[in-house]
Amino acid sequence: MKRIAFVFSTVPHGTAAGREGLDALLATSALTDELAVFFIADGVFQLLPGQKPDAVLARDYIATFKLLGLYDIEQCWVCAASLRERGLDPQTPFVVEATPLEADALRRELANYDVILRF
């Protein structure tokens, strides 16, 4: 079975990319257990709790990330440089447990996957 990486690189609200990526991730988890999730660039904002999407008439799907553990999706990585660039601390309580990696280590980890889907 191919190893599949899901890369979240966009802000959570304003586009449907994050929600669609999460839906695809959960659906794919029924087919394979060789999955990993990467949060890079503005995608790190997907990890923040307490968002108010109703203010922009968007659906609140961020809490659904908490289901990753129930779907046995345990490989979650977040770009440490992206966190710093956006003024976020790696110690921030995120909605999922994601391991911070520097950009070069993150690229090496991502290279281990056969298919990369970006949202």
Curated annotation (Swiss-Prot):
List, alphabetically, the Gene3D superfamilies matched: DsrEFH-like (3.40.1260.10)
The answer, when asked if tRNA processing is one of the entry's keywords, is: yes
**Which InterPro entries would you find in this protein's record?**
DsrEFH-like, Sulphur_relay_DsrE/F-like, Sulphur_relay_TusC, Sulphur_relay_TusC/DsrF
Q: Where in the cell is it found?
A: Cytoplasm
Q: Which GO terms describe its cellular component?
A: cytoplasm
Supply one GO BP term. Answer: tRNA processing
Q: What is its main location?
A: cytoplasm
Per the database entry, which stretches of residues form a coiled coil?
none
Subunit note: Heterohexamer, formed by a dimer of trimers. The hexameric TusBCD complex contains 2 copies each of TusB, TusC and TusD. The TusBCD complex interacts with TusE.
Q: HAMAP family attached here?
A: Thiourid_synth_C
The record describes the protein's role as: Part of a sulfur-relay system required for 2-thiolation of 5-methylaminomethyl-2-thiouridine (mnm(5)s(2)U) at tRNA wobble positions.
Q: What is this protein called?
A: Protein TusC
Q: Which organism is it from?
A: Shigella dysenteriae serotype 1 (strain Sd197)
The top of its lineage is: Bacteria, Pseudomonadati, Pseudomonadota, Gammaproteobacteria, Enterobacterales
